[in-house]
Amino acid sequence: SGHVFNADWFKWYGSEENPHPPYWEFRFITADTATKTGTRNDFSVMCEWGVYLGNLYLINMVRGKWEAPELLSTFSAFAAECWNKNQKQELGNLRAILIEDASSGTGLIQSFGRESPVPVTPIKRQKDKLTRAMDACPHIKAGKVYLPEGVQWIVEFVSEVSMFTADDSHRHDDQVDNLTDAIDYALIKNTSLFDMIYR
């Protein structure tokens, strides 16, 4: 069946033509974790996102396959790096950490939640993957989602998002889950100050 997302819908930032925003209004983290580390299993993915003038920017991502203790230490290091940026005003505050509340994510929420500098929000997905993808589509189509230019991991991200199919015949969708969670949090549920003033 047909692909849901079109790679051409994404906007890009980080070059002379498309400069980096002057600051982030706030930042947040999404995480989608896999239970098993076998070749055919999904990856665990953690993303850092920024919001500026009602648009969503992917800032950084770590993707891999880790057993529970290693997953916790990897995620803790990623979250600490994001949290430490708070010291610079233009980098905005880390406002939220969203972790899928399923399988290994539940364990991560419990163990990381105890040490987290920011409240951890467990994501309990009420809708199926396709519905969440369809909900996210109009926001990407409208040019509200920006990806960083010139970073190695973005190629794999765009490739996976482009390969996502309506009939679930695609191989992996862990990065798609992070994308739809981020859009749901920042663009669907969160009406920014910008939207209230200018729309």
What does each model-found stretch correspond to?
Residues 160-185:
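Charged alpha-helix within mobile-element recombinases
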Residues 1-2, 12-15, 183-199:
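Acidic two-metal-ion nuclease catalytic site recognized across multiple nuclease folds
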